[in-house]
Amino acid sequence: MIEESLNLIMPKRIDRRDFLRAAGPAVIAGPELARAARPWAPKPNTEPATEAAPRLLTGCCAYSYSKLLGVGKMTMEQVIRKAVELGIDGVDMTGYWFKSTDPAYLASLRHLAFKNGVCFSGAAIGASTVQAEPGKRAQVLEDIKKWVEVTESLGAPHLRVFAGKLPAGATIQQAVEWTVDTLKAACEYAGKKGITLGMEDHEGITQNSDACLEIVHRVGSPFFGINLDITNFIATAKADAYAQIEATAPYATHTHVRDRFADGQAVDLDRVWQIFARANYKGFMSAEYEGEEDPSAGVPKLVDKIKALCRKYSSV
């Protein structure tokens, strides 16, 4: 049962370059993804005690070590110890490589993190809310609820979720409706436990900032926002990746950082940090390494860039 449950959250990863090659110009500039911008009002600040300055915290996703975790050369316990070596503020516990969701195992991870002064910035699963069949959507909702409980057991405040790719014959608007309905219910459950859900701009309908904003506003929960991966938006004729990052940064609940886009072009990380600073973002800037180098060499290099920029643009 444990293995079956963990398989539900592990998406089949598609290389970003392969996705763009296979999708072609129709996806990059098509009318469904390149939707007209909607007149969403700026996100109001309803928390008068909130400091009016950015607080950019350093982090790393367990996913950065996927090459090692996936073949059993690393454990989640070692990910926690790596966070100590890297000198970061927190680690995002990607759920794909948990040995189980048994309470004793989760308690052991939480205790190990505490003893080493490591904060869990969140957890992450891969269940997709874009499901045409009501029964499948109900199963996804139950899976999210289960992982809200796992997140609570870890003592983490945030859970990353996906919307997903468009099924054959479905429209973007149908997918948005399915996602809104599922995530409204999920946020109602998560909010009672103080857990915030962050929908990642990952593969499919959320690779366009306007779709992300529509979902966020329609879900309408203080316990919901965007787990913003800075390299996942597909540029359109109206908005490049940076414009879409700027549009969604005020709604970011957690941020995943890479230093290259899918086409291999370098990300202007300084420009990205300026965007988050202007948005008064308060949260983690977590390395999610996918480079060619072995993670033991590549992750520290990316983390060093993150540290330098957080020092430059953060109030902490």
What residue spans do the PLM features occupy?
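Short active-site-proximal "capping" loops at secondary-structure junctions
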Residues: Y65, Y96-S100, S128
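Conserved beta-strand positions in the central sheet of alpha/beta enzyme cores
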Residues: D92, G122-A124, R160, H256, ...
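Glycine-rich, proline-tolerant flexible connector loops at the mouths of alpha/beta enzymes
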Residues: D92-R110, L166-G169
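Charged helix-capping and loop-helix junction motifs
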Residues: M74-M76, Y105-S108, R137-I144, Q173-L183, ...
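Receiver (REC) domain switch/active-site residues of two-component response regulators
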Residues: D89, P157, T253
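Active-site acidic/histidine proton-transfer and metal-coordination neighborhood
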Residues: A23-L33, N45-T50, R110-G122, T129-I226, ...
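Histidine-acidic metal/acid-base catalytic patches
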Residues: I2-L86, T206-V316
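Metal-dependent catalytic neighborhoods of phosphoester/phosphodiester hydrolases
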Residues: T101-A107, P134-R137, T171, S296-G298
